[in-house]
Amino acid sequence: MSTEPLADPAAGLGDPYAASSRETTEGRVYTVTGGDWDEFIDESAGEERIVINFGPQHPSAHGVLRLVFELEGETIVKARSVIGYLHTGIEKNVEYRTWTQGVTFVTRMDYLAPLHNETAYCMAVEKLLGVEAPPRAQTFRVMLMELSRIASHLVFLATGAMEMGATTGMTFGFREREEVLHLLEYLTGLRMNHAFVRPGGVAQDLPEDYRQKVLDFIKVMDSRLPSYDKLFTGQPIWKQRLKDVGYLPLDGCMQLGVTGPVLRSAGLAWDLRKVQPYCGYEDYEFEVPTSTGADCYARYLLRLEEMHQSLKIIRQCLDKMEPGPVMVSDAKIAWPAKLTIGPDGMGNSLEHVRKIMGQSMESLIHHFKLVTEGFDVPPGQVYVPVESPRGELGYHVVSDGGTRPMRVHVREPSFVNLQALPAMVEGGLMADAIASLASLDPVMGGVDR
């Protein structure tokens, strides 16, 4: 890459989108602007091709995603993904918060799998601290992650059906998802972005009637999931729209770093819950669905079966849930009183405040400093991955020994998987690009973060 100043683009010389540099009092500063999609459009000028900008406002773009397609008739010759419209600087923001406050940021990236983000981040912090969440909290986390996985796959079905014109499937998917959100809201007070998993465990224990509510949910899902087979699997139009569309074989997945249902649909049974167990997943009996179809239809069938397996895991969680604490006993990490929500659902209950205020002055000071300043984490760096609904979600966390992270980098599966889209759609029809994008199931909050 040249570092020499560029020719004036107004004079028609040089590339206005290459790199330039200049000397400052702090050293050499490099500037890069523009993007290859502009060159892509310019290359097509004068040829019998048409360039279409799909998004970022299109309802089928799965958020603010821009796709640039170069077409010959109805066939896509070139495709480019343009991202960054939903950048929120979460990784940088976490560096300015305490370790516990970081949970409230990471839960907002992949907003369809918030509990997976929270768990992966907290596991990384716990690994740096050298502590392990109590068994009850581990089981608790597994149950919440599987509920979140079901909710995410239901959104995949609902939005994918809507984009294919199957509006009945959309209403079915969002109807079942509401059941999951009701469960999570009853427990955490929020439908999404829960910030419920904490370093050392979880925020609070299960309500007394929560077990029965989960059993009722399982009963509802067992009765309703077969309807998806009747509505989609045996539907000839649905099958024709997805079969042999968005083909991505195993070697392509491996070269692009694709994980999750897209990789398993190509025949590789790579699921971190099995190959690198965490949170006690090695003690649960469940299958990892795979296929060799490597197309949109195989990914649909795979996610449908994964919901059945998640229900199987949730049943085992309820059986394994033994009495015990849900937070480590280390007073330097855990708050001195169990957090309970007030009757209005908006703040701490009087019992919570009374327990803190009723202790010694030293306990009150410790609580105040623990909440406002946070706890110290020994210096070091770790990488902790979990299996999210979209693939390998990994957290690389670096500590310099202080009360805040020095660096948090996220290996986001939506970001990695999205780069496979050109390989899936180039050479295919424009109408099939919608199905291919839906089968990747990207969440732009995680892609752009």
Swiss-Prot record:
KW Ubl conjugation (keyword) present: no
Entry keywords, A to Z: Cell membrane, Membrane, NAD, Quinone, Translocase, Transport
InterPro entries: NADH_Q_OxRdtase_suD, NADH_UbQ_OxRdtase_49kDa_CS, NDH1_su_D/H, NiFe-Hase_large
Cellular compartments per GO CC: plasma membrane
Domain of life: Bacteria
One Pfam family per UniProt: Complex1_49kDa
GO molecular function: NAD binding; NADH:ubiquinone reductase (non-electrogenic) activity; quinone binding
Membrane topology label: Peripheral membrane protein
Chief localization: membrane
Top enzyme class: translocase
Subcellular location: Cell membrane
Catalysis: reaction(s): a quinone + NADH + 5 H(+)(in) = a quinol + NAD(+) + 4 H(+)(out)
EC number(s) per entry: 7.1.1.-
UniProt cross-references to NCBIfam families, sorted A to Z: NuoD, PRK06075.1
PANTHER family: NADH DEHYDROGENASE [UBIQUINONE] IRON-SULFUR PROTEIN 2, MITOCHONDRIAL (PTHR11993:SF10), NADH-UBIQUINONE OXIDOREDUCTASE 49 KDA SUBUNIT (PTHR11993)
Assigned protein family: Belongs to the complex I 49 kDa subunit family.
HAMAP family with a match to the protein in the record: NDH1_NuoD
Name the UniProt record assigns to this protein: NADH-quinone oxidoreductase subunit D
Protein species of origin: Saccharopolyspora erythraea (strain ATCC 11635 / DSM 40517 / JCM 4748 / NBRC 13426 / NCIMB 8594 / NRRL 2338)
The gene coding this protein: nuoD
